[in-house]
Each structure stands twice: as structure tokens, then as C-alpha cells.
Amino acid sequence: METSINKYDPLKRIISFDDFDRGFCGWGQLVGNYEQSLDSMNPNYQQHTHPQLSNLSHWDSGSHGSWDGTYALKIQTRPITGSRNVSVKRLTFRKASRIRLEFYFTFKPEATELLLSETDVRSVGFLFDLQDPQESGNRVMPHIRFLNAENGEHVQKWQFKRKAPEVTPVGTDGKTITHDHLASEDWEDLPNGHQKLCYNEIPTKVNWHYLRFDFDLASMHMKEMQCNDRVFDLSQIESMK
């Protein structure tokens, strides 16, 4: 771990250090809420599948492997316009303090044809689903995404989401609700959020990008994000509640 950690800038205590050569490290499928029948699940959540451990195989020269090993966590979508997928890791916290998420990521379509296909991936992002520990505390859900392309055109900008969608009941027992907070509507542009991310000239190449996200659990506010060499001040950006 000592050498592997050098590519990150962690806070004082490391809660989770995920090396996917060791397995899924707690990451799994985000299953939509349901009651009594799977048919009661919101249709937009029914498309979610379990992530894969991938060595990034491709047809022209073999396998890329991960950033610094063999396996990466692959969150795959179906080859259908508008499809999406999410992987989730569920943790509770011991102290309401500043937390930091760091990871290296890459995104690309499957190389099924001899075309670059650089606008086939719509977006990639992350979110937290946090519960204020106070008795009357809010559910706070910071959402961040990189909008790579839209309608076949490059966009390449960071966005956030603060508007909560309508909550609907699930089943008949009155115990379960759902809301599609991952929907494509109501995303807002991050100020000065345009960023070009490196993309290679043939469809099988990948490039890894660094991302850091800081959040304060005490105040339940976003603080800062860094992607590669760009740093974004998020202190005035609202989270979904």
C-alpha cells in the first residue's frame, strides 16, 4: 500500500483503499426500491446491472489492464441511447468531519467498429447519498457529472444537480418510496466548468484521469473538486436535499 498510495493525496486517516486486483472491495449493483414484486421498481432503475472486474480487453492488441494492475471496476451500460448504470458502496461514518474521495477513471464505448466514437458516451460522474445524523436531519445528495457529449456533439463540461425529483410511493405498505435522482433532467453547469479530457486517436485506447472530491460531513456541504490539473471551488454549490 505504501507505494500505491503515492499517486493520491489522502487525508490523515484512510477509511477505504480499493484495489480491484483484490476483488470488488464492497462495490455492487444499485438496485431500485421495490416491495412485494420486482415489477414495483421504478423502470429507470431496472436497467442497472452489477459492475464487472475488467482487464480492459480489446480486439487489436489484447488487454490494457488497470491503472497500475490487472483489474479495474467496470460500470457498463447497455448499447442503447440514454442507458445508464451505477455502482454503489455503502458506508456509515464514525465522525462528522471532512472526507475525501479520490480515484482514477477512464471512459469509452466498446470498440465494436473502426471508428473513434468519442461522442458515444454521454456522461460519467459520482454522487453521495448522505444522512444527517440528527433526529430531524436532512438527506443530502451531492451529484457531480462530466457531460462528455449530447446528441452526438462534444460538450465536455462539469455539471451538478440540486433539484430533487418528485418522491413516489412503492408498493402498498407505506414503508418504501423512490425518486429518480439520476435522471437526465435538471443538471446545471458548474461555473467555469468546461474541461477537455484527453482522448486518444483510435477506439481501443484509454486514458486515466485523476479526480478528488472534498465534502464536509459536519456542515453537509461540498468543498472542492480537482480533475487532473483543474481545481473547482464547490463551497457555494448546493447539494440535492
Task: Enumerate the language-model features and the residues they cover.
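Extracellular glycan-recognition surfaces and repeat-rich motifs
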Residues: 24-74
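Secretory/extracellular carbohydrate-interaction modules
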Residues: 64-178
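Short, solvent-exposed beta-strand-to-loop segments that form ligand-recognition rims
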Residues: 220, 226-241
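Short tryptophan-centered beta-strand motifs in secreted/extracellular beta-sheet-rich domains
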Residues: 101, 207-217, 223-225
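Beta-strand-rich interaction surfaces with strong enrichment in secreted/lumenal proteins
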Residues: 5-6, 87-93, 195-203
